[in-house]
From Swiss-Prot:
Keywords: GTP-binding, Nucleotide-binding, Repeat, Ribosome biogenesis. The keyword Cell inner membrane does not apply. InterPro entries: G_ENGA, GTP-bd, GTPase_Der, KH_dom-like, KH_dom-like_a/b, P-loop_NTPase, Small_GTP-bd. It comes from Rickettsia bellii (strain RML369-C). The gene is der. Associates with the 50S ribosomal subunit. This is GTPase Der. Residues 9-170, 185-362 form the EngA-type G domain. Residues 363-448 form the KH-like domain. GTP 1 binds at residues 15-22, 62-66, 124-127. One of its GO terms (biological process) is ribosome biogenesis. GTPase that plays an essential role in the late steps of ribosome biogenesis.
Length: 452
């Protein structure tokens, strides 16, 4: 008889560094959501996804590798894993068959078993036939399975062991976890290292969900967090700090940077986090320009505002706005907020701005209003006459898409329309239709009517 598992269960992958937790995480989620690298300790935060083996669906947590590390950083990693263990219905405790059982494995298995959670010992990197040596039984788990996360072998055995460990439920009593319906606003938090991105997200959700500290570059992977704000389904995505390309030499940092850039590509809104103590470097402008080129909406947030002297704040803002508006014309009018993530000062305003600019990013303007505006704007400032006395005209336009707002404009000679005239039209449109801070795209089409 098939066992009845009604509620969606939570499974945590736990073990010392480099035993293959992130590889199994990617395997079970059927997507490459975790960075995998030979360097131990790549994962530093709890990472969540939906997992599946056959028809069995569950929530999956990847955790930092645990070591007997007494320093402050190691303790913060341990806190992340402890929270995952507390959340989980079942623990997959992972070890590496190639290295065998190490002292850390024994210490950590004792730590995990203290929580009295259902657990399966997962012996990874078993590419060949495997005999369970008595040393594995010394870890104290009564259920174990040999797998190769990299090659996908042993997944059916893993399924059997997991199902056997989970209690059977009555459908009337089981809690059913339905996905949140409606649009999900995906907000990526990006910026240079140590700008306070993770601290900001922790402050928003009121939970030490992400590892933070004074060390630059703690976050290595994009971490997704589902959240509700004022009835809106929000997916917050923390990303690794982005340094200049020329300063990135290690392969792991290249993977982290690529992961962060990829997150921007699929975002609805990007929060560009800037350190008030190191304001507006060229790299900040490069990130903002990349966001605009990808067609994403953007909100600029200056963090650590509490560390700026009151007497200097007005001059700081004046200079900041000047630089933004002169160097980022493609998102002119972008909202900028000044916060202290550490003190939770003005952090709710950031989400309100994200929701507002998201609506602008989705704005649809009727064709009649567009052409009324176009006629007025081009008559007020027409294009210059060409040779032969013929004037270039833009006679008609329509909106072809949103996200970002994109428009098709029909002209008798589109190749003669200058970039400066396009900027004039775009800036005028921003003011006329209240569209600050979002990329606006114009595509010119040559009209087939010779009399236009």
């Amino acid at each position: 008889m098939t066992k009845k598992i009604i509620a969606k269960k939570i499974i945590a992958l736990v073990g010392r560094p480099n035993v293959g937790k992130s590889t199994l995480f990617n395997r079970l989620s059927m997507r490459k959501k975790a960075i995998v690298h030979d360097l131990p300790g790549v994962t530093r935060d709890r990472k969540y996804t939906d997992g599946r083996i056959g028809s069995f669906e569950f929530s999956l947590i990847d955790t930092p590798g645990l070591e007997e590390n007494p320093d402050s950083f190691g303790k913060r990693l341990m806190e992340q894993t402890t929270k995952a263990i507390n959340e989980a219905d079942l623990i997959c405790f992972m070890v590496d068959s190639r290295s065998g059982i190490l002292p850390d494995d024994k210490l950590l298995s004792d730590f995990v078993r203290k929580y009295n959670k259902p657990a399966v010992l997962v012996i990874n990197k078993c590419e060949k036939a495997f005999d369970f040596d008595k040393e594995y039984y010394k870890l104290g788990f009564d259920s174990m399975v040999a797998i190769s996360a990299e090659h996908g072998t042993g997944m059916i055995d893993l399924y059997d062991e997991i199902i056997a460990k989970l209690p059977e439920e009555d459908s009337a009593e089981a809690e059913i976890h339905d996905p949140i319906k409606g649009d999900c606003l995906q907000i990526v938090v990006s910026g240079r290292p140590n700008a306070g991105k993770s601290t900001f997200i922790n402050a928003l959700i009121n939970d030490e969900r992400l590892l933070t500290g004074p060390e630059a570059g703690i976050t290595r992977e994009s971490i997704e967090i589902d959240w509700q704000y004022k009835g809106n389904h929000i997916k917050l995505i923390d990303t690794a700090g982005l340094r200049k390309k020329a300063t990135i030499t290690e392969s792991l940092e290249k993977l982290s940077a690529s992961d962060a850039i990829n997150s921007i590509k699929f975002a609805n809104t990007v929060i560009l986090m800037i350190d008030a103590l190191s304001p507006l470097k060229q790299q900040d402008l490069n990130i903002a320009s990349h966001v605009a080129n990808e067609g994403r909406s953007i909100v600029i947030v200056v963090n650590k505002w509490d560390l700026i002297k009151e007497s200097e704040k007005e001059a700081f803002k004046e200079e900041f706005y000047y630089q933004i508006n002169t160097t980022l014309p493609q998102v002119k009018g972008v909202p900028a907020l000044f916060i202290s993530a550490k003190n939770k000062q003005n952090i709710a305003d950031v989400l309100d701005s994200c929701i507002k600019i998201y609506k602008t990013w989705n704005k649809k303007i009727t064709t009649s209003k567009l052409n009324e505006w176009l006629n007025f704007t081009t008559e007020a400032h027409p294009l210059p006459l060409q040779k032969g006395g013929k004037r270039v005209r833009v006679k008609y336009m329509t909106q072809t898409k949103t996200r970002p707002p994109t428009f098709k404009l029909f002209s008798n000679n589109p190749e003669k329309i200058t970039d400066s005239y396009t900027r004039y039209l775009v800036n005028n449109m921003r003011e006329a239709f209240d569209m600050p801070g979002v990329p606006i795209r114009f595509n010119y089409i040559k009209t087939k009517n010779p009399y236009v």
